């Protein structure tokens, strides 16, 4: 039985999203048990509205406090010690849950998770990773997406190790290719940190492709794209904004007149397939990698449909033993890097 602790109070909408998503998820996956962490009376009231809730696999974990989207990290971490967010992470720490998930304040969730669970040996900083759909029909894993604004070359190497482990475990890629996000493919491009990181990656046992550019994320050039949190967050928000704009523009154009409405009716099957491929809700659920526990961050504005996919990401991470595989991969590669063992000739490429 896979056990997932949910911060039911987190996010822009809280219970109206988390409870319906939890119920649908529990019905879809009978091998899971969900710990619903939050204000008990409010959770009971929300569950009472759904007669189809599998109550035998929905356990309420009472909390007396809620971390709001506006709470400073210090307040969430130091003052609200009985918050639903804190207790969700604590459930993993205590072994009562295999994974935890929140749609709440990203900074607070990262700080609380790191404080409660600690980082893996060999990892200095956790990183946020998610999947972005590409033209191959698969997805590109991108990290870091905002946890670390300023990074050293060693941090980027650690992100690459964790991203490769995630791609292997969840996306089932035997030897994922890793690219370093840069302003050009050439070796001479980028700032000093990026150049140094490229050298470390080139000398590592990872399947390092070389420098990649922003368009390579959507082309599916590599399986994993590594960058610092500042750049990664800009990329993520740009992708989300572009997707919403294109969806809005397409709807407006098909509603322009009778001819376009008719064309839209004929094109509906194609448009539905396109929407399913690029719908960012289907890729909701970013993994906080590098911690001693499976931690998932849902988008704060996620609806119940999107939150359900974040729960699936948590389940997949546990089922694929992501934590164990990440720890093992980090230990193995860190040892090989420290011993000066380079990648075998021809195992990794470089486009420069």
From Swiss-Prot:
Belongs to the PlsX family. One of its GO terms (molecular function) is phosphate:acyl-[acyl carrier protein] acyltransferase activity. It catalyses: a fatty acyl-[ACP] + phosphate = an acyl phosphate + holo-[ACP]. Keywords: Cytoplasm, Lipid biosynthesis, Lipid metabolism, Phospholipid biosynthesis, Phospholipid metabolism, Transferase. GO terms for cellular component: cytoplasm. Coiled coil: none annotated. Catalyzes the reversible formation of acyl-phosphate (acyl-PO(4)) from acyl-[acyl-carrier-protein] (acyl-ACP). This enzyme utilizes acyl-ACP as fatty acyl donor, but not acyl-CoA. It holds the Pfam family FA_synthesis. NCBIfam families: plsX. One of its GO terms (biological process) is phospholipid biosynthetic process. It is found in: Cytoplasm. InterPro entries: FA_synthesis, Phospholipid_synth_PlsX-like. It is an enzyme of class 2 (transferase). The lineage of its organism: Bacteria, Pseudomonadati, Pseudomonadota, Betaproteobacteria, Burkholderiales. This is Phosphate acyltransferase. Pathway: Lipid metabolism; phospholipid metabolism. Its EC number is 2.3.1.274. Homodimer. Probably interacts with PlsY. Signal peptide: none annotated. The keyword Lipid biosynthesis applies.
